[in-house]
């Protein structure tokens, strides 16, 4: 019995070591707002969870992402509230829960994405040279404050979905023109400006958080030629970064074959970078976008969402270069007036407060443990575990309903 316990501990230690290079979690930038509104998060049994981040960690999630706006105070969208003080507090909680922290600089007062990369109002009068210095100083100051607050980031995005550049100008200035945009056919001056901004932001990251990994976030997943043009330019300009970050939403980016093509293309280019899916999500109720519709394969139901998640993870786990998976806005929960009710790809049932099945699939990305790994040996010598598991390590929420082979109490069980 002592020998079995020793072997178990050795296996568990090895398992943890192997898993440490992969990260799974979500962008939980609105969690404090739900908590302030009195939203109750529950576990699979319906019991209220007193510490949501501890619960996430216990369920196998090991990293969380938080967005940061420069000055969100004038935005009408209630979801745009993440100023530096907000992010420091949430970041500290994430770190105290033992998880990795990904900091997502938007370098804007509002949402930054391929359609809009508006310059913060306070920076609108700066020349390009002044803007290079500002992004360096701002990034450096934010990171200094994050460190002082006990919220040192482990991964840093220098821009959000910057496929076509960043800091185009204010919305009033840049909405109806292509100034400062970085398309494949854009003037080299636009790209040079963009690259200088990235280099200055990256310089601040290396100085203040030398252990953190820098992520360049591109969402041109369905257009590999456009995506690789972006990263070819980064390589040619010797931009300093560690991770290629991608967005992948089936409703906007196509089916899993499109994602696999993108991953294969990136790997064949041999950029020497890890790849992370820093944003993903799939609906449990109705379409979140109109570009593509895969409801015939993955119905807009809890089970359809779970199946998509399982298939996504199976695909990602075939690619050794992919070491991160983050669900966007998984914490959306309850029926409080926290923000506009348009997102229906969360991982919580708004009526029951319990996680959807897809929530429990996420940990398969890093390789969930099995009942064999969680055995313990009480004095009377009876071997026990913490539940029923599939042979590939997925914990069930009760006794299995389908026939098959399972693990229970450290032994194979045929149902």
Task: List each language-model region with its residue ranges.
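Hydrophobic h-region of N-terminal signal peptides that target proteins for export
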Residues: 7-19
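Boundary/entry segment of secreted carbohydrate-active catalytic domains
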Residues: 21-52
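Hydrophobic faces of well-ordered beta-strands that scaffold small-molecule active sites
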Residues: 24-28, 64-66, 101-105, 154-158, ...
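Aromatic-rich peripheral "rim/lid" segments of glycoside hydrolase catalytic domains that contact
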Residues: 41-42, 173-176, 261, 265, ...
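Glycoside hydrolase catalytic-domain groove-lining segments
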Residues: 49-53, 192, 203, 207-214, ...
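Substrate-binding cleft and catalytic face of glycoside hydrolase catalytic domains
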Residues: 54-213, 219
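Residue-level detector of functionally pivotal "anchor" positions at catalytic/ligand-binding pockets or at interdomain
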Residues: 368-392
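C-terminal tail/sorting-segment detector
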Residues: 405-415
